[in-house]
Amino acid sequence: MMLRLVTKGLPKVTPSAAKAVLVRGSLLHSFSTSARFNNSVAEDEAKIVLKDKNRPLRIDRELPDPTTERRKRIAGFLLFSVAIGSALSLIFNYEKTESPIISNTLYYIRRSPATKNILGESIEFDGIIPWVYGELNSVKGRINITFYIKGDKNVTGTVRLVADRNTHDEEFLIHEWSVTAAGQKIDLLAENTKTPI
């Protein structure tokens, strides 16, 4: 009976009242945490003491001099330019050596009796890296090339091909197609009825 009377005397706690109490508790906790953080920051700032209060706080370190090692940068740029130029030259030369005009020229040279008499069999490009000098532009109709060949007789020959045309509808007009080796110049136009172009 006494327990029942005490229970009746207590105020009823509604859900909204309980929620309000929880919100107040969380706000008080956040305020206390923020106050402690601000106090710690203030203590850390108080510990910083400037040697010269008239001068601003800065890092006492010399900045790098942009003019130093200028020669190294120039040398590196020159080496880079030479490497790029060499790579482009190799690419363009490879396109020339793989051209059908060069392949047809070598085909007719290998079948030339006069050329085989001087150079021998197995006629190929001379040198470790095949190189075609001059202009080889069939689109614009300009061909003026020179390259070196060699056979199994270890005699080096020079091939020269000069031709041009005015329009795409015309055929190439060959001005010179020859092989020079051992002091002799062989006219391939006189030997062949067909041309490499």
UniProtKB/Swiss-Prot annotation:
Compartments, record wording: Mitochondrion inner membrane
Side of membrane Mitochondrial intermembrane, spans: 95-197
Regions crossing the membrane: 74-94
Membrane topology classification: Single-pass membrane protein
A GO BP entry: mitochondrial cytochrome c oxidase assembly
A Pfam family annotated for this UniProt entry: Coa1
Keywords on record: Membrane, Mitochondrion, Mitochondrion inner membrane, Transmembrane, Transmembrane helix
Signal sequence, start to end: none
Main location: mitochondrion
Keyword ATP-binding among record annotations: no
Residues on Mitochondrial matrix side: 1-73
Keyword Electron transport: no
GO annotation, cellular component aspect: mitochondrial inner membrane; mitochondrial membrane; mitochondrion
Additional remark text: Present with 1680 molecules/cell in log phase SD medium.
Function, as annotated: Required for efficient assembly of cytochrome c oxidase in the mitochondrial inner membrane. Involved in a step coupling MSS51-dependent cotranslational insertion of COX1 to the addition of its heme A and copper B cofactors.
Subunit structure: Interacts with COX1, COX14, MSS51 and SHY1.
Similarity comment text for this entry: Belongs to the COA1 family.
Protein's UniProt name: Cytochrome c oxidase assembly factor 1
Organism: Saccharomyces cerevisiae (strain ATCC 204508 / S288c)
